[in-house]
């Protein structure tokens, strides 16, 4: 078992599960906003997925074939984009050389690959928490997205 790989699988699983959950929400919940969070749920999820694609591009030097569309993006499309990217993140998570490579953002700022790998995990978790906090404050029961829930769903629990 590879720890970084499981962290990336959890990141993808939790974000996809949250998107799927949000598809069942009424517009007043989706369009709500709360101080201390990024914005509405669709705006926050777009930000998460767009950042995933940007982080991937910086780490690999590859531009994704489909640029992120301008304007409103449906939740279903965000989920599709994450599903397409997930196997590529898994390859990166298994690349033992990547953490030590220097990666450079378009603005010229450089970091070790390990920093960007960690940031991608943290960023997604941070914004998922924003969404869960927003929904919880509105009295909406939220899905479990923790590592325990992921491990159970992935069949990782040992008898």
Give names to the regions the model predicted.
Residues 61-99:
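Helix-adjacent hinge/juxtasegments
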Residues 96-102, 142-143:
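A short coil-to-beta-strand element that immediately follows conserved catalytic motifs
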Residues 1-2:
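Short, low-complexity N-terminal intrinsically disordered segments enriched in polar/charged residues
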């Amino acid at each position: 078992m590879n720890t970084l790989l499981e962290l990336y699988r959890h990141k993808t699983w939790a974000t996809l599960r949250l998107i799927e959950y949000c598809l069942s929400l009424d517009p007043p919940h989706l369009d709500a906003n709360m101080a201390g969070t990024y914005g509405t749920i669709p705006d926050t999820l777009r930000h998460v997925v767009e950042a995933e694609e940007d982080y991937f591009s910086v780490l690999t030097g590859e531009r994704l074939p489909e640029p992120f569309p301008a304007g409103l993006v449906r939740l279903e499309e965000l989920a599709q984009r994450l599903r397409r990217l997930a196997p590529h993140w898994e390859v990166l998570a298994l690349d033992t050389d990547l953490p030590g490579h220097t990666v450079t953002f378009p603005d010229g700022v450089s970091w070790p690959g390990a920093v960007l790998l960690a940031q991608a995990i943290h960023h997604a978790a941070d914004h998922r928490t924003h969404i869960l906090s927003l929904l919880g404050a509105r009295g909406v029961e939220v899905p479990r997205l923790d590592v325990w829930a992921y491990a159970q769903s992935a069949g990782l629990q040992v008898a």
